[in-house]
């Protein structure tokens, strides 16, 4: 098709000026003006001297008309005809009927540039322009070319033009160039039609960039004037040598409703780039319409004038696409070899139609998709990340089938071109994007030839990137109607890695976020903000030291009432409630436990009162005392003696004692071996969790080695549970039954049904010992804590010395509790003997239960007994060590 192009938008076509191609970008008409057309025939090129002016070359073109051109001029007064295919295989819109005018050579003024008609189509097999012969039954009669005629053929073009007019309106500049085009193009277009009719061969240099590669002074002046009027910089608009590669601009819009060309498979990281500029939207854009040219070494995509170089396998003669030239470069490119630069130019390729029957077109998008970028932004900090995310990790782009740096394949040579904005002479300012060199050289870890790191994070691709056939995903930041969103954040791998001295002490992308170097020059933070005293219980602001701990007034009053009162608190949860400023009143049990753990005790306040009382007694002048004072002193002494019998250690043991744990047994079901044993195993795992929490809260336990802590718990858990169950049976059912849990109480029938009657009898006997010896709750708590440190491996623990010291301290605490109630040393020794004998009796019972549970675990699949995961692991790993003799209990008396 033939679409009229003005500067920055679609305008009504001048009398004889047509352009075959889609609307490209803002700089399309500028390129048409500044680039010098070459001779239309080889003989004309040879006849014209190198320094010939534009007027002489165009006069030669004027004289080379053909009979076909004369027939076209004579047949312009005919009626309009339907659309047809032109000589290049594209759908042609007939020109408007124009009166025949005498052809005259256009005058090339210094302020103007002579604009020729674009050349013929480019063959995909060779990448060179070639003229296709037109069918004999076709003619070039004109037809109206208004935008209304474009609507039926291209459904999205009418809506696209409205958006383009709003975004890219340059009416004043268009009028100036339109007048120049009407004067300068008529002769070139007529000579072009003559050559098309005659079928004369075209020169290899006869492409859209013109026959020559130089830019005249007049065209350069006009380019600068247009650039200044559009607010662009003119310092980069210099002469481009024949080998220099033009950098593509960053603003373009594809024609909608056009069937896509052959598209190769994208490289793997393109679809996986997170937060990149690519997405999977339904509306395909540049990647869908870019030309696949085997001559260039694969899929060419001109987002920033870069070539992915993904090699394809299309046939050489399967070209029906129209290759459009690159636009005006805003940056001066580095010089390359002329032949290599000609083959690897990265144009914006948008096929209008394919030779032959076209494939079904995709559904048209309701809006034009315009990509808006500022070319100057490539010097910013996020430019490297944008390029890296657009093409994915460059290291992974070098696929398994890629040719090596020295392969010498055509695709390898052609795909070596990269973004020429950054040269190899510039220093490396940013770290490499993505790393990993292996297998052929990645983007940052391979050889310098395969993946040289350019400044600003751009990584030059290795030679011969290979791709697969498939579809590219649509870009992510394509905004319909010209909407521009916020620029995505840069990738962490593309952030500048070399910072200034002030950033040396930051971590992460910017170093350690603490100014280590400035710590020597500033005062500590405590100098400006004194540390606030907080309550050890709830974290509120502390008012002072109350009852031996730094607490607030609320926790002080709570502890006084809870400790002096006889009410016993129970936690509704698992004795692990959160106690803070806002939730300290939710659970008084956990709050009181935390008070004891912090070291609060009523004796501390009484000792303080005793000290004040002694001072008062020393200061009294008279030595006489009243009966009331004597009574008060006796009460004080009795309270002090009571405090000495109830040390802080005992208060902590009372606070951390676990609560009641239920087994979850269904008592409505008939008792069976599998049901009873499964419930016992479930209860064992629940209690094991509480044992671990209780052990960690014991004074001095956390000072053990971590491995020793785990070993002590895994070896003593059975004895602790048996001892606690005996105490519950004594206090709840007077040792007549085994009180495992409130919902799991074993009577004689259940003892027999569980097939562990002998073990149950020994456990019941242990429970009866509590009654016979009249064990107090304080003695039980201290004995239970001492039982935790009564079984160790034969080889010893990692910190055996500290374990022995801790165990000895608990033995002394037990002796102190015994001595608190008895004044006779003989009675204390007898009591100590009884209690230690009771502790020794727990170990044989625990060993029998170890053997029973281990045998049951082995046969569990046969008897349908469920073992929880943690219980099964401990029984299968730790119990065999006890049964084999590698772990032995510590006895107080000889067995």
UniProtKB/Swiss-Prot annotation:
Transmembrane segments: none annotated. Residues 547-637 are annotated as: Interaction with HIPK3. Residues 527-894 are annotated as: Interaction with LPXN. Residues 534-607 bind DNA. Residues 600-894 are annotated as: Interaction with KAT7. One of its GO terms (molecular function) is nuclear receptor activity. InterPro entries: Andrgn_rcpt (IPR001103), NHR-like_dom_sf (IPR035500), Nucl_hrmn_rcpt_lig-bd (IPR000536), Nuclear_hormone_rcpt_NR3 (IPR050200), Znf_hrmn_rcpt (IPR001628), Znf_NHR/GATA (IPR013088). Residues 567-894 are annotated as: Interaction with CCAR1. The record marks 873 as: Interaction with coactivator FXXLF and FXXFY motifs. Residues 44-81, 175-200 have a biased composition (Low complexity). 17beta-hydroxy-5alpha-androstan-3-one binds at residues 681, 728, 853. Residues 1-533 are annotated as: Modulating. GO terms for biological process: androgen receptor signaling pathway; intracellular receptor signaling pathway; negative regulation of extrinsic apoptotic signaling pathway; positive regulation of cell population proliferation; positive regulation of gene expression; positive regulation of transcription by RNA polymerase II; regulation of protein localization to plasma membrane. There is a cross-link at residues 371, 496 (Glycyl lysine isopeptide (Lys-Gly) (interchain with G-Cter in SUMO)). Residues 644-875 form the NR LBD domain. A zinc finger (NR C4-type) spans 535-555, 571-595. It comes from the Eukaryota. It is found in: Nucleus; Cytoplasm. Residues 201-211 have a biased composition (Polar residues). Residues 1-562 are annotated as: Interaction with ZNF318. Phosphorylated in prostate cancer cells in response to several growth factors including EGF. Phosphorylation is induced by c-Src kinase (CSK). Tyr-510 is one of the major phosphorylation sites and an increase in phosphorylation and Src kinase activity is associated with prostate cancer progression. Phosphorylation by TNK2 enhances the DNA-binding and transcriptional activity. Phosphorylation at Ser-66 by CDK9 regulates AR promoter selectivity and cell growth. Steroid hormone receptors are ligand-activated transcription factors that regulate eukaryotic gene expression and affect cellular proliferation and differentiation in target tissues. Transcription factor activity is modulated by bound coactivator and corepressor proteins like ZBTB7A that recruits NCOR1 and NCOR2 to the androgen response elements/ARE on target genes, negatively regulating androgen receptor signaling and androgen-induced cell proliferation. Transcription activation is also down-regulated by NR0B2. Activated, but not phosphorylated, by HIPK3 and ZIPK/DAPK3. Binds DNA as a homodimer. Part of a ternary complex containing AR, EFCAB6/DJBP and PARK7. Interacts with HIPK3 and NR0B2 in the presence of androgen. The ligand binding domain interacts with KAT7/HBO1 in the presence of dihydrotestosterone. Interacts with EFCAB6/DJBP, PQBP1, RANBP9, RBAK, SPDEF, SRA1, TGFB1I1 and RREB1. Interacts with ZMIZ1/ZIMP10 and ZMIZ2/ZMIP7 which both enhance its transactivation activity. Interacts with SLC30A9 and RAD54L2/ARIP4. Interacts with MACROD1 (via macro domain). Belongs to the nuclear hormone receptor family. NR3 subfamily. This is Androgen receptor.
């Amino acid at each position: 098709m033939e679409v009229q192009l003005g500067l920055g938008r679609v305008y009504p076509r001048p009398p004889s000026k047509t352009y075959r191609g889609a609307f490209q970008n803002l700089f399309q008409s500028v390129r048409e003006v500044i680039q010098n057309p070459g001779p239309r025939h080889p003989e004309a090129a040879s006849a014209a001297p190198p320094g010939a002016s534009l007027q002489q070359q165009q006069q030669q073109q004027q004289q080379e008309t053909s009979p076909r051109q004369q027939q076209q001029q004579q047949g312009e007064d005919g009626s309009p005809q339907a659309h047809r295919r032109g000589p290049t295989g594209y759908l042609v819109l007939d020109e408007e009927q124009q009166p025949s005018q005498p052809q005259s050579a256009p005058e090339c003024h210094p302020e103007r540039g002579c604009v020729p008609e674009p050349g013929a189509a480019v063959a995909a097999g060779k990448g060179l322009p070639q003229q296709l012969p037109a069918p004999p039954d076709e003619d070039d009669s004109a037809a109206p070319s208004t935008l209304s005629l474009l609507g039926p053929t291209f459904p999205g073009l009418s809506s696209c033009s409205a958006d383009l007019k709003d975004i890219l309106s340059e009416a004043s500049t268009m009028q100036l160039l339109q007048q120049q085009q009407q004067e300068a193009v008529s002769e070139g277009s007529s000579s072009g039609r003559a050559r098309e009719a005659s079928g004369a061969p075209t020169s290899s240099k006869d492409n859209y960039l013109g026959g020559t590669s130089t830019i005249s002074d007049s065209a350069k002046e006009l380019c600068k004037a247009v650039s200044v009027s559009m607010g662009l910089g003119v310092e980069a608009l210099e002469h481009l040598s024949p080998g220099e590669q033009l950098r593509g601009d960053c603003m373009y819009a594809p024609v909608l409703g056009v069937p896509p060309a052959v598209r190769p498979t994208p490289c793997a990281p393109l679809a996986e780039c997170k937060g990149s500029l690519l997405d999977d939207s339904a509306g395909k854009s540049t990647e869908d319409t870019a030309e696949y040219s085997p001559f260039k070494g694969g899929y060419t995509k001109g987002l920033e004038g870069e070539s992915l170089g993904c090699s394809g396998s299309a046939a050489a003669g399967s070209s029906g696409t129209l290759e459009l030239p690159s636009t005006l470069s805003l940056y001066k490119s580095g010089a390359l070899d002329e032949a290599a630069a000609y083959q690897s130019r990265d144009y914006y390729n948008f096929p209008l139609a394919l030779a032959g029957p076209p494939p079904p077109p995709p559904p048209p998008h309701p809006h034009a998709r315009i990509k808006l970028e500022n070319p100057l932004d490539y010097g910013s900090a996020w430019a490297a990340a944008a390029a890296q995310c657009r093409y994915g990790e460059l290291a992974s782009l070098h696929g398994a089938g890629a040719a090596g740096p020295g392969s010498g394949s055509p695709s390898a040579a052609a795909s070596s071109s990269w973004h020429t904005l950054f040269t190899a002479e510039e220093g490396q300012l940013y770290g490499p994007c993505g790393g990993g060199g292996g297998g052929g050289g990645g983007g940052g870890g391979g050889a310098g030839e395969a993946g040289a790191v350019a400044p600003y994070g751009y990584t030059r691709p290795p030679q011969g990137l290979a791709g697969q056939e498939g579809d590219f995903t649509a870009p992510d930041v394509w905004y319909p109607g010209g909407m521009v969103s916020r620029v995505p954040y840069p990738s962490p791998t593309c952030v500048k890695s070399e910072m200034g001295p002030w950033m040396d002490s930051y971590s992460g992308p910017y170093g350690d976020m603490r100014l280590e170097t400035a710590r020597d020059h500033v005062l500590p933070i405590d100098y400006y903000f004194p540390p606030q005293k907080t309550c050890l219980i709830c974290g509120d602001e502390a008012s002072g030291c109350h009852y031996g701990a730094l607490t607030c007034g609320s926790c002080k009053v709570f502890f006084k009432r809870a400790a002096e009162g006889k009410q016993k608190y129970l936690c509704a949860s698992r004795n692990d409630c959160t106690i803070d400023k806002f939730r300290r009143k939710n659970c008084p049990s956990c709050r009181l436990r935390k008070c004891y753990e912090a070291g609060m005790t009523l004796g501390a306040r009484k000792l303080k009162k005793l000290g004040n009382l002694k001072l008062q007694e020393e200061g009294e002048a008279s030595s006489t005392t009243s009966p009331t004072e004597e009574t008060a002193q006796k009460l004080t002494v009795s309270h002090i003696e009571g405090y000495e019998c109830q040390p802080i250690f005992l208060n902590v043991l009372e606070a951390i004692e676990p609560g009641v744990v239920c087994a979850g047994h269904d008592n409505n079901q008939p008792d069976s071996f599998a049901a009873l044993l499964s419930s016992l195993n479930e209860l064992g795992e629940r209690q094991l969790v509480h044992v671990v929490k209780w052990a960690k809260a014991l004074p001095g336990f956390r000072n053990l080695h971590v491995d020793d802590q785990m070993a002590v718990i895994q070896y003593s858990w059975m004895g602790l549970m048996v001892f606690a169950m005996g105490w519950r049976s004594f206090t709840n059912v007077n040792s007549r039954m085994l009180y495992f849990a409130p919902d799991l109480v074993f009577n004689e029938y259940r003892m027999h049904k569980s097939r562990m009657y002998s073990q149950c009898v020994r456990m019941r006997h242990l429970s009866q010992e509590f009654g016979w010896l009249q064990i107090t709750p304080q003695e039980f708590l201290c004995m239970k804590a001492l039982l935790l440190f009564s079984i160790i491996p034969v080889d010893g623990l990692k910190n055996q010395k500290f374990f022995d010291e801790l165990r000895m301290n608990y033995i002394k605490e037990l002796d102190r509790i015994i001595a608190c109630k008895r004044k006779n040393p003989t009675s204390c020794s007898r009591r100590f003997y009884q209690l230690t004998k009771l502790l020794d009796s727990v170990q044989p019972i625990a060993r029998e239960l170890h053997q029973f549970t281990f045998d049951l675990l082995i046969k569990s699949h046969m008897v349908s007994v469920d073992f929880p995961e943690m219980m099964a692991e401990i029984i299968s790993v730790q119990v065999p060590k006890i049964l084999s003799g590698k772990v032995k209990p510590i006895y107080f008396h000889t067995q």
